[in-house]
A protein has these predicted regions:
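Class I (Rossmann-like) S-adenosyl-L-methionine-dependent methyltransferase catalytic domain
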Residues: 1-89, 93-125, 148-149, 167-226
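Internal, well-ordered alpha-helical scaffold/interface segments
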Residues: 103, 139-143, 156
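A short acidic, Gly/Pro-enriched loop at the edge of an enzyme's catalytic core
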Residues: 126-136
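A short SAM/SAH-binding and catalytic strip from SAM-dependent methyltransferases
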Residues: 135-149
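A short glycine-rich, Lys/Arg-flanked "PGG" loop and its adjoining helix->strand segment in the class I
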Residues: 152-164
Length: 226
């Protein structure tokens, strides 16, 4: 993809997600219902953490005390999962392409010490301070990104900020049968099992586990080599 095409995609991602945040942020973050109370919305984030994090603490913590860990969330949205992460880990940093979503997250998480949320450009982590992270996580985010190249750039950037041996656990769209287009910021680019393995290797990760290939919820466990 030429740089102009990529910049067009990134601007559309930002504009579309800003619009969705203004229309009904919680619906677009979790499409199960149109109206969410605060308790329902953040409880849904706790459910994700219970299912995907707390059942996997051996891989995630690797002997570390979670209260001493610094974690990164890609695509924090309105802070749904971010809040739940902060209830388990000592320090949580989140990034999102939408400034509108980031504003919502900052307001919702103002009472949570150790939580930091940043607006980024949708493909890298240059907005983060010079920190090393013990774990990175992303759920129902990459499934909306319209370009495999942008997804891979994110993966490479996560590799850059993780400590050696740390895990990046994330979900991508695995269903190759869905019809997508380069400007679709809802049904993003699917990733096959072979593409996931090649991506991991190009970015310096070991793709130790992969579950759900060919399905919407294709989970990847990428461990940073070293």
């Amino acid at each position: 993809m030429n740089p102009i095409g990529r910049q067009t995609q990134l601007k559309k991602m930002e504009a579309d997600w800003d619009r969705r945040a203004r229309e009904n942020a919680r619906f677009y973050v979790v499409t199960g219902q149109t109206e969410w109370s605060d308790e329902e919305f953040f409880q849904s984030g706790r459910k994700t953490v219970e299912e995907e994090i707390l059942t996997d603490m051996t891989n995630i913590c690797q002997g570390k005390d979670p209260r001493q860990m610094r974690v990164l969330e890609i695509g924090c949205g309105a802070g749904r999962i971010t809040r739940a992460l902060s209830e388990t880990f000592g320090e949580v940093h989140g990034v999102d392409v939408s400034g509108e979503m980031v504003d919502l997250a900052r307001r919702a998480l103002a009472d949570r010490p150790g939580v930091h949320v940043y607006k980024n450009n949708g493909m890298d982590l240059s907005v983060l301070p010079d920190l090393e992270f013990d774990f990175a996580f992303s759920c129902i985010v990459f499934q909306h990104i319209p370009s495999r190249a942008i997804i891979e750039n994110y993966v490479r950037e996560v590799h850059r900020v993780l400590r050696p041996g740390a895990l990046f656990k994330f979900q991508v769209q695995g269903c190759a049968e869905i019809e997508t287009s380069p400007d679709d910021t809802w049904l993003g680019a699917p990733i096959t099992d072979q593409e996931a393995v090649r991506m991991a290797e190009r970015c310096g990760f070991e793709p130790r586990y992969r579950i759900g290939a060919g399905e919407q919820y294709f989970w990847l466990w990428f461990f940073k080599k070293g």
